Amino acid sequence: MDNVAQLETDTNFQSRKKITWGVFSVLLLFLVAGILYYFFVYRFYQSTDNAYVQADVTWVMPKISGEVMELLINDNQVVKKGETLAVLDHRDYQARYDQARSVVSLKEAALGVQQQNEKSARSSIIEANSGVVAAQADLARLKKEFERYQDLLKDGVITRQNFEGIQSQYLTAQAQLSKAQAAVNAAEAQLGSLQASRAQLLADIQSSHANLNLYQVDLASSKVVSPVSGKIGSLAIQKGSRVSPQTRLMAIIPENSLYVQANFKETQIEKMHIGQKVKLKLDAYPSLNFTGKIESFSPASGATFSLMPPDNATGNFNKVVQRIPVRIAIDSSPHIDLVKPGMSVSATVDLRT
């Protein structure tokens, strides 16, 4: 009996020994596999699940106030750049534009009259100058006659009455020359006044054109057009809504504007650089694989841009690992239409690329 019991004991010991060695071998194999995986795979990747899909959202806002007369799009609709999205009540702006255009027309007509008056004034100056030339010729002729008559009077050839006659003509010629010169001065003054008035009128026309352009801009702004091609979201108006400048009417997600913002720990970015490949997994579609590339790094940690950045100079210091936002461009994919801003993402950077 003792031999049988001893044999069973030895058999059990050997079995336990084999099991122990088997378990130890499996654990050792896993350990070696883990070490090999770390050295050949894991240490070349940095991952984070603190990542989200983002987009350069374009907010559409009106430039003028008014009631929405027509709404030409629906929420989630695809639109093209320059497409009319809504039409605001433009009757007031149309009336102001028409009035400003009438003012411009009136002032331009007045400018035409002014230019005609200037033309007449120049003709008057030419005519007055002709009168001066004629008066100067008469005066020169009569002056010679006057001087000749003076000599004849001294010699007693003519009577005093004859001399006074030519003297009267000579004085009249002097008066006529003065009158002609005064007419030239008056015509030139009139032209100067007209030219000054024209300068003022031109300034008024320029100002009127500026007002007309402003009203034209306001009138054109009654049509709300899409600044980019993309997809409508967050539609906040309907027909009959009253809007004002800086009111957010809707958002547009531009085409090809999606990217991932991954917030890596500061201890993870040592070997990261722009252009490295990134594997992306969306929580919404875990079976789909997306890829991307590092596009840029934030100039500061996320906490730096918060409304209340941490102040570690107060003496109450707790060291916290900071997060650095990394922008990742998403590569083209057949399933890119499934990617929406705000989705959660797991990002894994391949440090070997």
Swiss-Prot record:
Keywords: Antibiotic resistance, Cell inner membrane, Cell membrane, Coiled coil, Membrane, Transmembrane, Transmembrane helix, Transport. Gene3D superfamilies: 2.40.30.170, 2.40.50.100, Helix hairpin bin. It is found in: Cell inner membrane. GO terms for cellular component: plasma membrane. It is a single-pass membrane protein. GO terms for biological process: response to antibiotic; transmembrane transport. The keyword Lyase does not apply. Induction: Cotranscribed with emrB. Induced during osmotic stress. Its main location: membrane. InterPro entries: CusB-like_dom_1, MFP. Pfam families: CusB_dom_1, HlyD_3. It comes from the Bacteria. Probably part of an efflux pump system that contributes to adaptation to osmotic stress and resistance to colistin. Belongs to the membrane fusion protein (MFP) (TC 8.A.1) family. This is Colistin resistance protein EmrA. It comes from Acinetobacter baumannii (strain ATCC 17978 / DSM 105126 / CIP 53.77 / LMG 1025 / NCDC KC755 / 5377). The gene is emrA.
